[in-house]
């Protein structure tokens, strides 16, 4: 035999084994017997008989009757009038305090104070990226931890 025919025959045998192997690619398919499937189906049917159907309509009087156990602890919710889509003059002018919730002077003062606090914080607190001082000391001695790379 020539090398071409040997290669062709070996390729065809390999292809045949691959095709036969793919028919049994899912080992779980044959692992479940028909008897097990029938038992599972019977169990599901039995559970469906015990469970109430979602399509059944519950009478409205059952829903409106207060539960005796929870009825004593619950009080009725106050009626809230529906929103008409109109804004009251107090809301339009900036709320009850006479200014908007995002007054620019208050917001800028808050941002300035936070930035000042960040800049005046100790160096170790500013550079600590994970856990804090203790992890910083461990990292400095062992090379482990969050701050193992110093700038």
Curated annotation (Swiss-Prot):
Ranges in coiled-coil conformation: none
Region (Disordered): 62-105
One protein family per Pfam: ANP
Phosphoserine, modified sites: 129
GO molecular function: hormone activity; hormone receptor binding; neuropeptide hormone activity; neuropeptide receptor binding; signaling receptor binding
Keywords: Atrial fibrillation, Cardiomyopathy, Cell projection, Disease variant, Disulfide bond, Hormone, Phosphoprotein, Secreted, Signal, Vasoactive, Vasodilator
Region spans: Important for degradation of atrial natriuretic peptide by IDE: 147-151
Posttranslational modification: The precursor molecule is proteolytically cleaved by CORIN at Arg-123 to produce atrial natriuretic peptide. Undergoes further proteolytic cleavage by unknown proteases to give rise to long-acting natriuretic peptide, vessel dilator and kaliuretic peptide. Additional processing gives rise to the auriculin and atriopeptin peptides. In the kidneys, alternative processing by an unknown protease results in the peptide urodilatin.
Example GO BP: cGMP biosynthetic process
Source organism superkingdom: Eukaryota
Signal peptide: 1-25
Keyword Transmembrane assigned: no
GO CC terms in record: brush border; cell projection; collagen-containing extracellular matrix; cytoplasm; extracellular region; extracellular space; glycinergic synapse; mast cell granule
Site (Cleavage): 123-124, 130-131
Cysteine disulfide links: 130-146
Propeptide residue span(s): 93-103
Disorder noted: Atrial standstill 2: A rare arrhythmia characterized by the absence of electrical and mechanical activity in the atria. Electrocardiographically, it is characterized by bradycardia, the absence of P waves, and a junctional narrow complex escape rhythm. Atrial fibrillation, familial, 6: A familial form of atrial fibrillation, a common sustained cardiac rhythm disturbance. Atrial fibrillation is characterized by disorganized atrial electrical activity and ineffective atrial contraction promoting blood stasis in the atria and reduces ventricular filling. It can result in palpitations, syncope, thromboembolic stroke, and congestive heart failure.
Annotated family: Belongs to the natriuretic peptide family.
Protein name (record): Natriuretic peptides A
The organism of origin for this protein: Homo sapiens (Human)
Gene: NPPA
